[in-house]
Each structure stands twice: as structure tokens, then as C-alpha cells.
Amino acid sequence: MNIQLSEHFTYKKLLRFILPSIIMMVFTSIYSVVDGIFVSNFVGKSAFASVNLIMPYLMGISALGFMIGTGGSAFVSKTLGEGKKKLANQYFSMLVTIAAIGGFVLSVLSFIFMRRIVMAFGAAGNLIDYCTLYGRISCISLTAFMLQNVFQSFFVAAGKPQLGLKVIVAAGCTNIVLDALFIGVLHFGIAGAAFATMTSEFIGGLLPVVYFFRKNDSLLHFVKPVFDRRVFLKTCTNGSSELMTNLSMSLVNALYNLQLMKIAGENGVAAYGAVMYVNFIFVATFLGYAIGCAPVISYHYGAGNHAELKNLYKKSMSIILVWGVILFGAAQLLAPVLSKIFVGYNTGLYAMTLHGFRVYAIAFLIIGINIFGSSFFTALNNGLISAVISFLRTLVFQVIMVLTLPLWFGINGIWSAIGVAEALTLIMTTIFFVRQKDKYHYL
């Protein structure tokens, strides 16, 4: 049974509708996680540290796709809610075209200057060659990866979250199989990991292009794009929080790596990489919920349905709070197993990773509220508040904590920086929720 954006959502219906988006995000995060597991265990900790050093740049560059996907889907969903389907398809086609062109330009520039980039991100010695090789191969599929990020949001806006899930599952399974083949069997090393990811990203980014070009029964399909500067700027504004989130995360992750290189050397970077890979999967569930729920919120906001906005807000907050507690408990219980999967071959590195992950996991209790808060205001077409929450959460507070806490607490200050930053962001998010309730009528 297909669930429409216009329906009233019970807990069961809301979770059924959003679950495909959550699974999509989890499988997307698996790309880098599987690479990390195979590289760490089959190639070694130097190669593993190299992937961790270049990953912030690659994820930062792909932020264009998240910005256009989340910001554009909010605007397109609002337009659909207003009953303007033809206009919505024109906007959709324009935004995908812009993402493809922008992705191609960034891919070419990144490929050319990759060696300089990896050195700027802290690579030294033999790590430079590892980083450059992995980065340049990844650039080949960077445009497809951006389109994949765009379509994650637009599949939901089109009323086809299950189809988006199938595409991502296919891409994720491809990545896992090829990692095992290229690294475990053929021993291609770090290049094998990059080729596996490249292939899976082509599947995730290009299959949706084929679908939306063909006749389909979804709410969206490709038409002749007409450039509308106002719509593009509004999309950038709406999606600025997601852009800021990804760019800030890239900068902060690079800062974490630089700090850890000073305090603990290569082992510190490898330990942080293992923690972040697990974090990708855990946080992906919150991101998936936010992505899946945003078009529904935008639709009812565009339709002026205040009662359903209240319903969606209250149910979402309850779900996220409960899930945060579950993730925190799971992280504490599974920390030994998860750490051993990545770095079980080195006793000292394993101990550092285990301790770091348990401290880091405290943030899971509240991180979901902050992610939802930013996405919620994006869905309401209030890009400014969304961007402020995202800017404080992913950049300002984390940078301050990563730079200052280690002065007093050493490496423990690095592990606890995320929790303190999320707590400070929660205070600001709560203030925005309270102050904006009369304007948007969600409380």
C-alpha cells in the first residue's frame, strides 16, 4: 500500500513511510565503512589512516548534492502541495541539471589538484601517495555520488521512497561484493577500495536518472529544464544548513585528524577513523529520518494543514528521543565488538578505539534532536534558522571544543568534544523551537 504525502500519519504509518530513507542513508554510509574494514584489515593501518585523511575532503565536495537535494525537495514538495505539478517538475529537472554540471566541474578540479589537497589535509610521507591514489579514483564517480545524494531526497518527494531504497541497496551490495573481490581476493589494495566505491556510486547516481527520464507513475519526472534564478537561490538558502553541515563536518574531521596526529600520531588517526565509521552508520539513522520526514512536513506546510504539522512534530520528537537512548545503549554494549572489527589486529590501537568510542557515544543521546531541528526548519522553508543550527552544531561549537578541551584533558578532550558541542546546540535548538511555534503552528 502506497502512503501519500497528503495523508494523516500515525506512528506506524510515519515509520513505514520514513524507513526506506533511513535504510538508504545507512547503506550510503556503508560505502565508506566497508572500505574502512577491508583497508584496515587487509592493507594495514597506514592505508586506513590515509583513507581517513582524504575522506573529509571527498565528503565536503559532495555537499553540493545534499544542499540541492534537501533544499530543492523542500521547495518542490511545497510546490506540489500547492497543486502546481508542472512547475514542480520544471524545478526538479533544473536542479538535477545544475547538480550534474557542478559535480563535473568539481570532479575535474579535484582530480588535478588532489596531491596538493591531501598535503593540506595533513598527509605526510607514504600517506601522501595512498591519499592521492584513493582520492583521484574517487573523483571519477564524484558527480554520480552527488546525484545519488540529490535523488535520495527527491525519491521521497516523488512519493517513491521504496524505489530509492532499492537503488541504494543495489549500490551498497555492489560495494560490499567488490570490496571483497578487489581487496580480499585480488589484493588491489587501497585502489581496490576506491574502484569498488566508484562502481557502487555510479549505480546509485545513474539508475535514478534513467528512471526519471522514462515514463513513471511518480509525482516527478524529467521535463525540459527552465532556469529560474529565484528558485535556485531559494534552494541554496533552504539547503544551506545541509551544505554547512557537510562542509563543517569535513573541516572538523580534518581538525580532529590534525589534533590526533599531534597527540597520538598515526594510531590516533586510525582510532578516530574507526569511531567515525561506526558513527556514520548510527547518525545515518537520524539523517534518514530527517530526510524522509522533511517532504511530508513541507507538503503540509504548503497545504496550510497546521493540525498535521503538530502531529508530525510531536511524533517525530518522541521517536527521535527513544531512538537516541537505544543507540547510546547499543553503542556501549557493542563497543568491544565494533572496535575489534576495525582494529582488532593491534592491541594498543584497539584499547584506544574502545575507550574513544564509549566516550564519543554519549552524543547519541541528543544528536538526533539537533539534526531533526535543522531539517525541520529547512522543510518549513526557513533556511536561515536551519543554517544557524547547523553552523553552531557542526562548526562553531565543535571547533572550539576540539581546540580547547585537549589542553586540559588530552586525548579524552578530543573524544568528549562532540558531546559538549551537541549539548550546547541542543540549548539553541530548543530556543528556536519555542520562539517559532506561533509562526508555524507546530505546537
Predicted regions and their residues:
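Short alpha-helical transmembrane segments in multi-pass integral membrane proteins
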Residues: M1-I18, V76-T143, V185-S240, I297-A363, ...
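N-terminal transmembrane alpha-helices
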Residues: S6-V43, P56-G71, F75, T79, ...
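Transmembrane helical elements of multi-pass membrane transporters/channels
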Residues: R16-D35, I137, A171, S200-G204, ...
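Transmembrane alpha-helix boundary and packing residues in multipass membrane permease domains
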Residues: S21, M25, I37, N41, ...
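Helix-terminus/linker motif at the lipid-water interface of multi-pass membrane proteins
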Residues: I30-F48, V118-G125, L181-F188, S250-Y277, ...
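Small-residue-rich hydrophobic transmembrane alpha-helices
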Residues: F48-V108, F145-G164, A271-A335, I367-I389
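Hydrophobic transmembrane alpha-helices of multi-pass small-molecule transporters
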Residues: G60-A63, N175-A180, G205-V209, F280-A284, ...
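Short runs within selected transmembrane alpha-helices of multi-pass transporters and secretion channels
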Residues: G69, I137-V156, V167-N175, A193-L206, ...
